[in-house]
Amino acid sequence: MIALIQRVKSASVQVDAEIVGKIDSGLLVFLGVEQQDNIEAMEKLATKVISYRIFNDENGKMNLSLKQAGGALLCVSQFTLAADTGRGLRPSFSKAATPEQANHLYEAFIDYCRLQGVETQIGRFGADMQVSLINDGPVTFNLQV
């Protein structure tokens, strides 16, 4: 399971010109699910995302987690993160989970974050989305489990 996380001052996602998710300060999370992923991997990744200390403390040091900083999370499904780009000039998506498996783990990820007390907004699984953000830093990490 893959989470590309970006620290943002704000972010939103639109589907058919309608805003379906919007946050102020926090994390924009692009979530990719691979075939071998399961609930255990999802819980491990979700815990890492919400606990990862990438927000500045009072001394300007990256030392606070999303929860400690009081930030929100905007989660967007993105199967292209599971692409194999090692050969040729066209990505292969053979490692990506089926839409059914990916949607199940995407929804479980969202539920898990909410149960941990994190304000969580979402995109729409499988939709053509337009994502807008104002990066903070920029600070971007690729987390995998």
From Swiss-Prot:
InterPro entries noted in UniProt: Daa-tRNA_deacyls_DTD, DTD-like_sf
CDD domains xrefs: Dtyr_deacylase
Keywords assigned by UniProt, alphabetized: Cytoplasm, Hydrolase, RNA-binding, tRNA-binding
GO cellular component, one term: cytoplasm
Any GO MF annotation of the entry: tRNA binding
Pfam families given in the database record: Tyr_Deacylase (PF02580)
Entries under Gene3D superfamilies matching the protein: D-tyrosyl-tRNA(Tyr) deacylase
Motif Gly-cisPro motif, important for rejection of L-amino acids in this chain: 137-138
EC number from the UniProt entry: 3.1.1.96
Alphabetized PANTHER family for the sequence: D-AMINOACYL-TRNA DEACYLASE 1, D-TYROSYL-TRNA TYR DEACYLASE
Oligomeric form and interacting partners: Homodimer.
Entry function: An aminoacyl-tRNA editing enzyme that deacylates mischarged D-aminoacyl-tRNAs. Also deacylates mischarged glycyl-tRNA(Ala), protecting cells against glycine mischarging by AlaRS. Acts via tRNA-based rather than protein-based catalysis; rejects L-amino acids rather than detecting D-amino acids in the active site. By recycling D-aminoacyl-tRNA to D-amino acids and free tRNA molecules, this enzyme counteracts the toxicity associated with the formation of D-aminoacyl-tRNA entities in vivo and helps enforce protein L-homochirality.
Family under the similarity heading: Belongs to the DTD family.
Name under which the protein is recorded: D-aminoacyl-tRNA deacylase
Organism of origin: Shewanella denitrificans (strain OS217 / ATCC BAA-1090 / DSM 15013)
